[in-house]
């Protein structure tokens, strides 16, 4: 499977949640927010627990372009699914603004070979199957802030590295 069509612009969203509420948010998110975002033009291909941080939820959302990102986010966040469930989702969160806006260093994000663990790393191991760097374009949807204290580089790999973070896919994560 390739995600090339949707990897032109990538958000790595890292939420800090109130203690003990991660699974509550994941259940709500997977039930109410995946299909509406996909219908709006976003592609959600990674939804993760972070075993070392039980009150964090990380996820990846891709877009064809910055303009497509703007349109998809306007459609979703001003639409019925978010309006119906935003309070419930926001009640689980302490912080949802730790967001990296990224672009591919090399096109061709493909599903890695099957394995039991997936890592996000801040220094590229030789086994990296996807590499991204800060997207320098202005944020086209300022209602959702993105970090501007970069630049950042992010790699995904199947093997651990000293600077990596183990990610555990949720039931609906396409990256496994």
Sequence positions of predicted segments:
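Short, structured motif recognition centered on aromatic/hydrophobic residues
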Residues: 9-13, 25, 37, 57-63, ...
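Surface-exposed beta-loop interaction hotspot
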Residues: 91-124
